[in-house]
């Protein structure tokens, strides 16, 4: 199965990067966005034509916030925009539930999420190579057709990414830990810079810049993302809160020099234990992971 025509709905960083990657392989791409200036900017970059096609395209990619996936899909299917549909949102379960309930033809849709991005947003930050060698999760439902599954795999191949298949809920639980909660933690830390001692930011090293870099993301988009995965993110933050409370108590104990040695020893152990667990956790990011075979689509 080969994609010859593609529609991209939403010309931000991810949507425009998908369009640029497809254009690099000779695919005819049509662009649409509520923000006309974003469409024009993407078109100037060579991402495609700033209009929707007259005839149905092979695949439509919905690059809109998670809360908008289901209503936009219903609208596009009603007008017959494409033979198959996918999206690139970073939350899957919410849209999946709504699509199964409301979409004119859920069999033509498959959820998708390329795990790639930049701290900058908008079409001018887009890159055709953004997805190269990056995981791209697909979340087929019990109704997803072979055609929709196959076209999504074709798109992933065009973008140079690596397909992985997951259930929507498992995906959302995973990215709550690896993406959504870290973004909030980075925002909390960065926000303190505006409330800290005068000129404290001038003493910042590369470590703080690395820690807070992702806080530069589009706040409205990230609010939608976190809200769409609120329960899973709250669970992660609750566990962080428990660890943080233990460390705060330990630090106050260590700061009180009049405390006994036994109590100080326990507090020091709490602190060292957290640092050790953190170092071990970073190692998880360096561990090679075996590739997951892509199973046949549900039907």
Predicted regions and their residues:
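Rossmann-like NAD(P)-binding element
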Residues: 52-86
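Rossmann-like NAD(P)(H) cofactor-binding subdomain of soluble oxidoreductases
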Residues: 72-125
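Residues at the starts of beta-strands that form the adenosine-phosphate
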Residues: 5, 28, 108, 135, ...
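Interdomain hinge/lid region at the active-site interface
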Residues: 199-277
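Short glycine-/small-residue-rich Rossmann-like dinucleotide-binding loops
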Residues: 64-66, 90, 114, 189
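Phosphate-coordination loops involved in phosphoryl transfer and adenosine-cofactor binding
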Residues: 2-5, 57, 82, 133
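NAD(P)+-binding Rossmann beta1-loop-alpha1 motif at the extreme N-terminus of oxidoreductases
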Residues: 1-51, 59
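Internal alpha-helical scaffold of NAD(P)-dependent oxidoreductase catalytic cores
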Residues: 128-216
């Amino acid at each position: 199965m080969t994609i010859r025509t593609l529609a991209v709905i939403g010309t931000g960083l991810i949507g425009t990067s998908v369009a640029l990657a497809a254009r690099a392989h000779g695919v005819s791409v049509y662009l649409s966005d509520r923000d006309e200036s974003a469409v024009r900017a993407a078109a100037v970059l060579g991402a495609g034509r700033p209009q929707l096609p007259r005839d149905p395209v092979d695949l439509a990619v919905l690059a809109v916030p998670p809360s908008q996936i289901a209503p936009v899909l219903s609208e596009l299917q009603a007008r017959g925009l494409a033979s198959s549909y996918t999206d690139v949102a970073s939350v899957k379960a919410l849209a999946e539930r709504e699509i199964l309930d409301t979409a004119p033809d859920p069999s033509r849709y498959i959820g998708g999420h390329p795990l790639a991005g930049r701290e900058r947003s908008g079409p001018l930050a887009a890159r055709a190579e953004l997805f190269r060698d990056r995981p791209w999760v697909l979340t087929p439902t019990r109704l997803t057709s072979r055609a929709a599954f196959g076209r999504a795999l074709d798109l992933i191949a065009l973008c140079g990414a690596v397909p992985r298949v997951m259930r929507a809920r498992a995906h959302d639980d995973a990215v709550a830990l690896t993406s959504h909660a870290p973004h909030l933690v980075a925002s909390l830390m960065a926000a303190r810079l505006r409330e800290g001692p005068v000129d404290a930011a001038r003493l910042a090293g590369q470590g703080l810049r690395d820690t807070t870099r992702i806080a530069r993301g589009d706040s409205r988009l990230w609010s939608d993302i976190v809200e769409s995965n609120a329960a899973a993110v709250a669970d992660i933050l609750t566990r962080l809160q428990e660890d943080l409370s233990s460390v705060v108590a330990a630090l106050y104990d260590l700061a009180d020099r009049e405390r006994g040695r036994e109590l100080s020893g326990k507090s020091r152990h709490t602190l060292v234990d957290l640092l050790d667990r953190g170092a071990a956790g970073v190692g998880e990011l360096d561990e090679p992971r075996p590739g997951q075979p892509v199973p046949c689509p549900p039907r």
